[in-house]
Every structure is written in structure tokens, then in C-alpha cells.
Design a protein with these regions (language model features):
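N-proximal, solvent-exposed amphipathic alpha-helical segments enriched in charged/polar residues
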Residues: 2-47
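Short, hydrophobic beta-strand segments
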Residues: 2-10, 59-69, 132-134, 277-281
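Extreme N-terminal, non-catalytic leader segments
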Residues: 42-45, 50-55, 61, 68, ...
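Conserved catalytic-core segment of NTP-binding enzymes
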Residues: 107, 245-248, 252-289
């Protein structure tokens, strides 16, 4: 029997003396967490990976993965991806996967790995993310549709894109992007849901692989048609949390879908993200400009 048994989240696992175990670990390294978009081997999600010999001369891949939270909605997807990856290893004739969940210490280690400090990653020294605020003078001119289409276009070119739906009182981005699931919460760290770049006939439009869009919206935290009656400081704190406590990871582009006009939200965003470029959406009507 040969195995890799990493200790701790994000551990660098030394090469074993078994080529089969190394090949199994390398195969599992091609599996990414669908939300974090990083290999599960880097995130400490593989507790056990071993190749066990069988009587017929083949080997069974015995793998245990740890989900970030109990009841993770992506359990089936991750398990299927692990099975598929392990089955590609030459010499592996059967795959068995055990699924567990991280304990508190493992989650804390993961949080420290993902976001060691509560800082604004988009204004920090060396930040490379290009930030665009999509704005309009009035509602109903297609601002949110423009935001969603820009995100899809950027992602189709292989870029990592984030959207903050800052239109708190008229959020629509989750629906436009086809996102129904809620964000994953690691205590006070929020992991936004992600969608892959648009595809046509199985191919990413534009031919560039790897693009995706991560979305956060107040609508993901509300039940049904629950209204939002926030103003001033409450709005600022909510938007600040979207920037400081949401782990987008390394983004090429961040899009802000702002509400129409120049109210509290626009003022807060200009303070939180002063480096944002503006994309003004309008129609030919005088009232829109």
C-alpha cells in the first residue's frame, strides 16, 4: 500500500517513494474547489490518498476528502471530480471516495490561508485587479444587463471576474447570472458562488479556457421577497463587508453594479474603491442623461 496523508490545511506534501501514490496525488491536484477555484490538494481538502493493492493485481484508489462545511451543496460535484481524476491514474482499477467535513481547527487554518488579514484587497499595495463601477443616471436603462454581459464577455476570454451587486434595493445580478445557491460561510469569511464562462457546443466562447465569474449580492442573504430598508451607515457596513469579508481570490476584473443616481451607495463605494473606473449606461432619452 502506498499513500499520501497530508497533515494540516494547505500542507506541502513531500514526494513519496511510490510512483503510483505520487501519480494519484498529482491527479487529485487537478481537481479544483468549484467556489475557491484552487486545487483541493492545496486547500487541505484531501485527508487521505492511498493506492491499495488488490488480489487481481490492480490497485484501488482510497481517497478521503474534507468539505469546507457540513452539508456543502457542492458535495456531489467535488466527489464526482475526485472519482474522475483518480480513475485516470494508470494502474488504478477501482476508486473509493469517503467524504467528510473539516473540523474547526482545519477551517481556521483554511481561513488564515485564504485571507490572513481583514484588508481591502482591491486597494492594497500591488493590487492588480481592474475595478469598474457600472452606473446610470436613472433606472431601467439596462445597467445590470450591461454588468452581466461585461462579466460574461471578460470570462469568455479566460479572465477571472467578480461582481459586487451593490444595487441593494433593486438587486438582479444573481438572477441574470443564473445563480440560485447561497454563498458558503466559513465563520466570518464569505465564499461567493461562481459560474464558468459561457459555452457554445462545449467550447468556451472566444477560445480562452479557465474564465469564471464570482458574484456576491444582498439578494443571496434574503428569503423570498423580503424588502431591504437600509440607509446610510447600515448600507456602508454591508458594502464594506462585501469587500473586506468576501474571498474573491485573485481577480482580473471586478465589476460593481451600482444603483441609479448618486445616493448613499455611490458615495460609500467611492470611498471604499476610489480607484474604480466608471462605465456610464444611458439611453438617448433626455431623462436618462
Amino acid at each position: 500500500m502506498s499513500e499520501h496523508s497530508p497533515q494540516g490545511t494547505g500542507a506541502n506534501v513531500p514526494a513519496s517513494d511510490s510512483p503510483l501514490a505520487d501519480a494519484l496525488w498529482a491527479a487529485l491536484g487537478t481537481v479544483e474547489d468549484p467556489e475557491l477555484r484552487r486545487p483541493i490538494t492545496e486547500l487541505g481538502m484531501v485527508e487521505r490518498a492511498q493506492a491499495v493493492s488488490e488480489e487481481d493485481g490492480g490497485y484501488v484508489a482510497d481517497v478521503k476528502i474534507l468539505l469546507t462545511i457540513e452539508g456543502c451543496p457542492l458535495k456531489t460535484t467535488i466527489e464526482q471530480d475526485v472519482r474522475k481524476a483518480a480513475s485516470t491514474v494508470e494502474g488504478i482499477t477501482r476508486v473509493q471516495v469517503e467524504v467528510g467535513a473539516m473540523n474547526a481547527d482545519q477551517r481556521n487554518a483554511l481561513k488564515s490561508q485564504l485571507k490572513p488579514e481583514r484588508i481591502n484587497p482591491f486597494t492594497a499595495p500591488g493590487a492588480l485587479t481592474r475595478v469598474f463601477a457600472v452606473v446610470s443616471g436613472k433606472g431601467g436603462v439596462g445597467k445590470s444587463s450591461m454588468t452581466a454581459n461585461l462579466a460574461a464577455a471578460f470570462a469568455s476570454r479566460g479572465l477571472a471576474v467578480g461582481i459586487i451587486d451593490a444595487d441593494v434595493h433593486g438587486f438582479s445580478i444573481p438572477g441574470l447570472m443564473g445563480i440560485r445557491e447561497a454563498p458558503t460561510r466559513l465563520d466570518d469569511l464569505i465564499i461567493p458562488p461562481a459560474v464558468d464562462a459561457p459555452r457554445e457546443h462545449g467550447q468556451v466562447r472566444g477560445g480562452a479556457p479557465g474564465g469564471f465569474v464570482k458574484v456576491i449580492s444582498i439578494g443571496m442573504f434574503l428569503k423570498g421577497n423580503q424588502p431591504v430598508a437600509w440607509r446610510g451607515p447600515m448600507l456602508h457596513r454591508a458594502l464594506e463587508q462585501f469587500i473586506l469579508d468576501v474571498h474573491f481570490g485573485a481577480l482580473d476584473i471586478l465589476l460593481l453594479d451600482l444603483p441609479p443616481g448618486t445616493g448613499d451607495i455611490a458615495i460609500s463605494m467611492s470611498q471604499l474603491l476610489p480607484n474604480a473606473d466608471l462605465v456610464l449606461v444611458s439611453t438617448p432619452q433626455h431623462a436618462a442623461v
